[in-house]
Amino acid sequence: MERIYQKYTNENTEIFTYRYFDDTKYHLTNNQENKTLILNESSGYLFEIPTINFEFDYSLSSLRCKYFFDNSVLTTSFENKNPYTDKKEKGWEIYLKEWLIPYLSNDEFLKNNQIEKIIENNHEHDFLNKYERYSFYLHIKEMPENYYPFYCISIIRNKNNYKNFYLFVFKSKTNQIDTFEKICKSFKEIQKRGKALNVQVEYQPIADENWNDETKKYYAKLSNQKSIDWGIFTKSLVSKQDDAFDYISNFYKNEGDFYDKNMEHNFELLPTYMHISWAGKFNYFPKELANEYAKGDGFNKKKVLHFTFQYTASNNTSMVGYTPVFDVLRGKYDEYFRLLAKDLKEYHHPILFRLNNEMNTDWTSYAGIITLLDPDIFIASWKRLYEIFQQEQVDNCIWIFNPIAITTPYSNWGEYLNYYPKGMVHMLGLTAYERGNMKKYHSFAMMYKKLYQKNTPYFVKFPHIISEFGAGCGGEAVYDYEQHKYLFLPVCRNLDKQVNFVNKMFDEIKKYPDYVKNIKAAIWFSANDYANVNNKDYIMNYFCLDEKVAPTISAFKKGFKKVGKKSKK
């Protein structure tokens, strides 16, 4: 770095060094010119910000770095996760259009969410002589004063490198395009030394002091138990206002205890999902059915309600359409949230409350790829609901933060730790699926050991819950990405592998290794995924535990006995 020092330093320069093991960064402040050069040695780049008065956050340095100044936040990241590098330029184009800019560049999406272009998108083929740069300048309309409505986003890539690039996301309370342009034009790659590292800390779960006695006792029991509570998701509960109420009510009346009977196990959890709305109609808390089929408190032999709530108005299907996330920040759902809060509080019994799961993906309406490549929007929208619950004195919700095991888009900026709403979480949710369509079949141990390692040390103090998972037995329509078409295969062809998965899973649970010790509850997702091919629906992922997979149901029955769970009487 000595030569860089010589070029950028003079008698007015002060040097600050940040060092965390092999992670080194330098701040060269020029008091006379009121600017600071940021040398990110461990990630191999530098740039300049037009101030000497700023704060920074390097706690997740391997993923992103943040700088706070002049009513703005600059987030920078070195990106190196493009999986299509064997295709060179074509591979870069696939990654760019599929996993970086599909919504930033989509006029329909912007219009549907009241986001306007400040100026037109810009693609510079010869930026600073050796780079390619994609830039977007956006304004989120009608945002409250305490948020940042102006976004400038640039993707900078050396034209000869199809894997590595740099992402700059600059948000501000006023239009600061000129500032952003100066920052980007000061960018330069430098020799990389050391390694960017996250600060290795153990996040702390803090029990809500406002919880009622029932919830406090349940959380303490769940956190300290050495066994796993179980649930199986089949169909979501609905409110009495819902058109499907009679159908769902009859289903639970006639088939609600199917798994309890056939697996000879008293299931401890009742999982259900609810979206903000569907087809333009609000969804409401299913208090009638929850009171009839749940009401568990961890001690009374009834099922504890596991309630997943998602900011979506389309069941996460119309991705270029409307997402409620921006309106959540605008406060347009505050009244609805207060009604939800009152309903949940009135229910009284403990609720495992999972908000906006699988945010680190490209298929949810609140994913970072949709929220302008800025995970902070997810955190802000989480905080909005959390604070309303606090104001309404909700005293029975145990909040679950539940990313998916493998982040997609493959990226650093979109990794799950960037979404963590610190201080507003009581449990860590886990989700890793084996879809069961390929020759290679991942075991429970393979998936959840890896996930345990990924979550260590950050979440070792948290009780963990597998809020949804499954192992498929083989769907009938499987997409082949090499041939770019669906293959039609025998359904349930991998049933023997599914049975083996369940058998080995209970073997692991009985052994009680470190990666299992924090898992306090688990929910099998007993519903199939479908693909529409030529206007016909085919099962794509077969997770449903029905009569076709009787050997798997039998394996669960044997497994519960193996680990000593009480049988249905």
Indicate where each model-derived feature is located:
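N-terminal targeting sequences that direct proteins away from the cytosol to non-cytosolic compartments
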Residues: 1-72, 162, 166-202
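Conserved polar/disulfide-associated segments of primarily extracytoplasmic proteins
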Residues: 52-159, 165
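Substrate-binding cleft of secreted/luminal carbohydrate-active enzymes
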Residues: 197-253, 463-569
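Alpha-helical scaffolding within the catalytic cores
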Residues: 248-259, 284-295, 337-340, 405-420, ...
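Substrate-binding cleft of extracellular glycoside hydrolase catalytic domains
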Residues: 278-398, 490-493
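Glycoside hydrolase catalytic-domain groove-lining segments
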Residues: 283-310, 423-427, 433-479
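Aromatic-lined carbohydrate-recognition surfaces of secreted/lumenal glycan-active proteins
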Residues: 382-413, 461-475, 519-527
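Substrate-binding cleft/loops of secretory-pathway carbohydrate-active enzymes
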Residues: 404-431, 476-482
